[in-house]
Curated annotation (Swiss-Prot):
It is an enzyme of class 2 (transferase). It comes from the Bacteria. This is Putative S-adenosyl-L-methionine-dependent methyltransferase MAV_5150. Its EC number is 2.1.1.-. GO terms for biological process: methylation. GO terms for molecular function: methyltransferase activity. The lineage of its organism: Bacteria, Bacillati, Actinomycetota, Actinomycetes, Mycobacteriales.
Length: 313
């Protein structure tokens, strides 16, 4: 169960809704990619995602400005610039955590990867995948189409066998995944990054049930668990809308339901061995601590990884 912020706006989501890359949930993928692009272009980056800038700038000039590592669109708002920088730091740390997760999974011999709600995730292109690795990317058809076409247009090629699976995670995605060549008998490395609040609580449970059912012994899963901070979301939304004309109200795009399962508890109760870390601790460990005066505005999340049928290492 999750404590809810009563000041959050009502969700605008509807059953069966869909989107392009600049609409609804698709636009949040652009926002995350903009943070990765800004981090990559900045000094001493934690991550390197040379594809993020291409994916963001191709969506329009306002998105390209959002990816500016100097955040020049906030030059006259020092507080907003610092708060936005903390958001970039969080995305960089989150990306770094899950990059390390995949590195560990590959060292364990896993060669089958599934990225749930892949959005503009470019790991199939930018990570060093061993020969024989297949990366399945599940997301809305138009989102996957945008990524594929944009990167092809710029001459980018995947570093692994990449298999897009255009299906909504609220639908029968296991059938679509299997049709794309997924083999449940092989250990799999799953990723659910920036996903859970965009699913209804019952769909989240079904997602974990299906992931578990499709996972052979030795499989791993990594998950980001985060809630919505009404104050920080409102301020971020207003800054982007007023200065860039980008209307991306994340709180209105997520489901705020009191019966949502605790991801770590659910996985533990279904045979997974879970290791988790608070994002603030991970940010401090990597040299990107949240300034004390911005603590109330910064994201709070838990980053976790889990193994099925073995220790977490």
């Amino acid at each position: 169960m999750t404590d809810l912020d009563s000041s959050l706006p009502p969700s605008v989501r509807t059953a069966g809704d869909s989107w392009t890359i600049t609409e609804l949930v698709g636009a949040t993928a652009l926002g995350v990619a903009a943070a990765r692009a800004a981090e990559t272009a900045g000094p001493d980056p934690l991550i390197r995602d040379e594809f993020a800038g291409l994916l963001v700038s191709s969506a329009g000039p306002a998105w390209a400005r959002l990816a500016d590592p100097e955040q020049s669109w906030l030059d006259d708002d020092p507080h907003g610039k610092r708060a936005h920088r903390v958001g970039i730091d969080y995305q960089a740390v989150r990306t770094h955590y899950f990059d390390e997760y995949f590195d560990g999974a590959l060292r364990a011999g896993i060669r089958q990867v599934v990225i749930l709600a892949a959005g503009l995730d470019s790991r199939a292109y930018r990570l060093n995948w061993p020969a024989g690795t297949t990366v399945y990317e599940i997301d809305q058809p138009k989102v996957l189409e945008y990524k594929t076409e944009t990167l092809q247009r710029h001459g980018a090629t995947p570093a692994a066998v990449r298999r897009p699976v255009p299906v909504d995670l609220r639908d029968d995605w296991p059938a679509a995944l299997t049709a794309a060549g997924f083999q449940a008998a092989r250990p799999t490395a799953w990723l659910a990054e920036g996903l859970l609040p965009y699913l209804p609580s019952d769909a989240q449970d079904r997602l974990f049930e299906m992931v578990t059912a499709l996972s052979a012994a030795g499989s791993q899963v990594a998950v980001e668990v985060f809630g919505m901070n009404s104050r920080s979301n409102a301020q971020r939304w207003l800054r982007m809308r007023e200065r860039l004309g980008l209307d991306v109200n994340v709180a209105a795009l997520t489901y705020h339901e009191p019966d949502r399962s605790d991801a770590a508890a659910w996985l533990t109760g279904h045979g997974w061995r879970v290791h988790s870390v608070d994002n603030r601790d991970e940010m401090a460990r990597l040299g990107r601590p949240v300034p004390e005066d911005l603590s109330d505005e910064a994201v709070r999340s838990t980053l976790l990884r889990a193994h099925l049928g073995g220790s977490t290492g």
